UniProtKB/Swiss-Prot annotation:
Gene Ontology MF, one: imidazoleglycerol-phosphate dehydratase activity
Record family assignment: Belongs to the imidazoleglycerol-phosphate dehydratase family.
InterPro entries hit by this protein: IGPD_sf, ImidazoleglycerolP_deHydtase, ImidazoleglycerP_deHydtase_CS, Ribosomal_Su5_D2-typ_SF
The protein's name in its UniProt record: Imidazoleglycerol-phosphate dehydratase
Entry's localization field: Cytoplasm
Disulphide bridges, residue numbers: none
Residues making up the signal peptide according to the UniProt record: none
Pathway: Amino-acid biosynthesis; L-histidine biosynthesis; L-histidine from 5-phospho-alpha-D-ribose 1-diphosphate: step 6/9
Enzyme Commission designation: 4.2.1.19
PANTHER family membership: IMIDAZOLEGLYCEROL-PHOSPHATE DEHYDRATASE, IMIDAZOLEGLYCEROL-PHOSPHATE DEHYDRATASE HIS7
Native organism: Pelodictyon phaeoclathratiforme (strain DSM 5477 / BU-1)
Length: 200
């Protein structure tokens, strides 16, 4: 890692408070994969803990949401705040790899993620799930989580399930593929902003 970039701590904290949720997130990109996640949605906690372990990000997340309604607002708003926090930690993106991709197996499931941190928000999601809910987490919210995150991260994210039957395995493989793709994309590989525009 170039010394002048290495010295700058790539960390950020962001909050969001509405009538539906109260969220605070701190992200450190060059971390050790440690996490303290309390989303109020147990399965989402499990997925975000896995994301940190495999991306190397450190994450502190606290969310109080209207789970008496359902999990939609909490999951959506966590994704929005997480995306904006990572974007802030990236700063001007000087020296980053920008692109990342991974294909990750989990037993019978096989997930693929390719992404670009180039400042353009877009999400393509190809996955179907057999179970509607896992531990309070609506599986339809997996796609919405990544769409919301792509919006505030200003990232182009493509996620697909290539094989699989078990819903837990498929979702976990998607989060792990996203983790490894992000690990590559945020890695410092040079000293320049990786765009012919001169900014991203």
């Amino acid at each position: 890692m170039p010394e002048e970039i290495k010295r700058a701590a790539r960390s950020a904290t962001a909050s969001r408070t509405t009538h539906e949720t109260d969220i605070t997130i701190t992200v450190t990109l060059d971390g050790s994969g440690t996490s303290s996640v309390n989303s109020g949605v147990l399965f989402l906690d499990h997925m975000l803990t896995n994301f940190c372990k495999h991306s190397g990000f450190d994450l502190e997340l606290e969310c109080r949401g209207d789970l008496d309604v359902d999990d939609h607002h909490s999951v959506e708003d966590i994704a929005l705040v997480l995306g904006s926090t990572i974007a802030e930690a990236l700063g001007n993106k000087r020296g980053i790899g920008r692109y990342g991709w991974a294909i990750i197996p989990m037993d019978e499931a096989l997930a693929q993620c390719a992404l670009d941190l180039g400042g353009r928000s877009y999400c393509v999601f190809n996955a179907k799930f057999n179970r509607p809910v896992i531990q309070g987490f609506s599986t339809e919210m997996v796609e919405h989580f990544f769409i919301s995150l792509a919006g505030t991260l200003k990232a182009n994210i493509h996620l697909s399930i290539l094989e699989g039957e078990n819903t837990h395995h498929k979702i976990e493989a998607l989060f792990k593929a996203f983790a490894y793709a992000m690990k590559a994309a945020v890695a410092i590989t040079g000293t320049e902003i990786p765009s012919t525009k001169g900014q991203i």
